Amino acid sequence: MTTTVPSATNVLRTAFQKSVANYWNLEKDPVNIKLGEVDGLYHHHYGLGPVDPSVFEGPDETRDERMIKEMHRLETAQADVLLDHLGDIAPTDALLDAGSGRGGTSIMANHRFGCEVDGVSISEQQVAFANGQAHERGIADRVRFHFRNMLDTGFQTASRRAIWTNETTMYVDLFEAFGEFSRLLAPGGRYVCITGCSNDVMGLRSKAVSRIDEHYICNIHPRSQYFKALAANNLVPINVVDLTADTIPYWELRAQSSVATGIEDPFLTAYKEGSFHYLMIVADRV
């Protein structure tokens, strides 16, 4: 199913990719680490759903701990929403997590479906960490993480029943990425994307969106670009959901927590002014 693991030179082909890999190799933000320590699932995405009001009740000295646990619950809920849209997955199917971070969503997918999951990342640190998590859980024979480029994964054509990207497409050319996903998906296969995208209706990107780009060393795409790239690569949307309103409570909670990074205000500003959307796109390979 897999090929020889490529060298760093083959994986990181541009100066931009090298800078992104370096960022994530060095990244140890408490907002990712402390939340993962709650139950051992390490996410690199944001949360969805209403905040449990009990977080703000109880002793002040344990309030931040309650906030950490609640943010982690909301991030896990986001991954569940993504997995809900992968369609009918059998234990014999193979899935791909493109931009797999520290492995949380891949591990959840295996737990839910019992199938094989491969994750790819250009961060060697993330790959090593995620493989360690799979080994600790005794699922390393079913869940594997690879130091590879999602634009050229090396996996066999039509080998995947479903693929997802969870807040990773802002690091790649959409036409190249969706071309690779189209190659990997079997006919009728499912692609699910959750992403932040700029609002074409507003014209040029806002100051808040530009600050998000600068913070994460990424390139947020306009909403229209996603649908152009999908259409060009035989990926036909079946469901599009604006999750913006559902993620705002998470960001408002995070802004009050001890793990706030300073990017919370730009996110909240961009969401509330309408220049930025949190979108889920579900598409089938035809």
Model-found features: residue ranges?
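N-terminal auxiliary segments of SAM/dcSAM-dependent transferases
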Residues: 1-42
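A short glycine-rich, Lys/Arg-flanked "PGG" loop and its adjoining helix->strand segment in the class I
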Residues: 176-190
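Conserved alpha-helix/loop element of class I SAM-dependent methyltransferases that forms part
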Residues: 52-58, 72-91
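Short, glycine-/aromatic-enriched active-site segment of Class I SAM-dependent methyltransferases
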Residues: 196-217
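Class I SAM-dependent methyltransferase SAM/SAH-binding core
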Residues: 94-96, 105-147, 151
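Conserved catalytic loop of SAM-dependent methyltransferase domains
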Residues: 239-260
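Short alpha-helix
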Residues: 218-234
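A short acidic, Gly/Pro-enriched loop at the edge of an enzyme's catalytic core
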Residues: 151-163
